[in-house]
Amino acid sequence: MNHIEKFLANDTKGFEARKELFEKISDELYAIFYENKKVDFDIDLLFEEWINQLGFLGQSIKSLRTIFYVIENEDKFLDYHLKAVKGTLIVHSERWLNHFEELTPNEALILHKVLNT
């Protein structure tokens, strides 16, 4: 079973193991969205499960950049996906601010706009 199948099965035990698997999926989504990586699986199902676990497990800069991608490309996503990622960005802002120095000026502007709406 590969990491995508494990993630979708949601049967990984232990917080650290789940967090590690989540970060692998964040890397995968980052590559799909930012590097146009071709895939042979249902991206919608993977993205949906990623959103479900984002508030609990998301911490990396790639998770944050995936959030920014959704916000910048809102026309490509369902409305509730956009609301979910913005909500996670706001509710867990202290976690995401740990990456502030790594942000591009555009990403910092997106973060500012979302946190001040």
Report the location of each language-model feature.
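Amphipathic alpha-helical "stem/stalk" segments
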Residues: 1-117
